[in-house]
């Protein structure tokens, strides 16, 4: 079984080596790892130097460079299209964050998860899930969004906004075949809605969500406003097409 790992990255040259250093102990060296990198030139160079050292050890790692900050959704979508064009026979594609919030343990667990699904979401809100290091206000906001968005979109999941996901080959093909309405983090909600409408199977598994290793969140006020507008756009179009 071949699994591709896609990691969107924005100036995370410090945290990504920590994440990959632990992950590659249990990652098949022949399975591709694609870094969708929107970092500035300094961060990009440091990242490339580290990734080259992993290539020298035999790991199959590639970088898909963005000239600007494309937003998470656009970066991952481009990496998916690259995977579909260059590694056509893969079984699954996993998306995970570069900042250390997604544990390598959970990535490996989802890779090896035996129950078949088209979209497998690592959820922060199942019985055995945990969130480490979040303030009460951040928990409340996340919990609210993950209640209201699935409710309005009629998707039975507990965590529609987390970016730790495993896609079947079919799901990756489908989400790359349409023109998305949004970018950034709200793209995750749009993507789940599209997969549901294609009558593909969505499942969740519990994960432990960790604090980012370095720095603070790269999500800006502009990103949040854009996400809210994107959600309204998805909801409006979803209702109009019913």
Place the predicted regions along the sequence by residue.
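A conserved acidic beta->alpha catalytic loop
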Residues: 37-47, 100
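Acceptor/aglycone-binding surface of glycosyltransferases and processive sugar-polymer synthases
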Residues: 61, 66-83, 92, 102-183, ...
């Amino acid at each position: 079984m071949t699994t591709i790992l896609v990691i969107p990255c924005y100036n995370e040259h410090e945290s990504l080596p920590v994440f990959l250093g632990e992950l590659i102990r249990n990652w098949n060296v022949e399975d591709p790892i694609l870094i969708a990198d929107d970092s500035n030139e300094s961060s990009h160079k440091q990242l490339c130097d580290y990734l080259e050292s992993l290539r020298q050890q035999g790991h199959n790692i590639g970088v898909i460079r963005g000239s600007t900050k494309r937003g998470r959704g656009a970066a991952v979508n481009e990496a998916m299209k690259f995977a579909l064009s260059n590694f056509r026979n893969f079984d699954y594609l996993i998306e995970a964050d570069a900042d250390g919030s997604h544990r390598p343990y959970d990535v490996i667990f989802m890779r090896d998860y035996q129950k078949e699904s088209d979209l497998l979401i690592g959820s922060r809100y199942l019985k055995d899930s945990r969130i480490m290091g979040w303030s009460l206000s951040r928990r409340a906001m996340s919990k609210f969004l993950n209640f209201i968005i699935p409710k309005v979109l009629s998707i039975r999941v507990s965590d529609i906004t987390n970016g730790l996901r495993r896609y079947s080959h079919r799901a990756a093909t489908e989400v790359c075949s349409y023109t998305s309405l949004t970018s950034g983090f709200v793209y995750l909600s749009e993507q789940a809605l599209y997969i549901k409408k294609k009558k593909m199977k969505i499942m969740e598994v519990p994960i432990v969500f960790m604090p980012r290793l370095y720095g603070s969140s790269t999500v800006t006020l502009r990103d949040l406003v854009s996400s809210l507008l994107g959600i309204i756009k998805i909801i409006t179009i979803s209702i109009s097409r019913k």
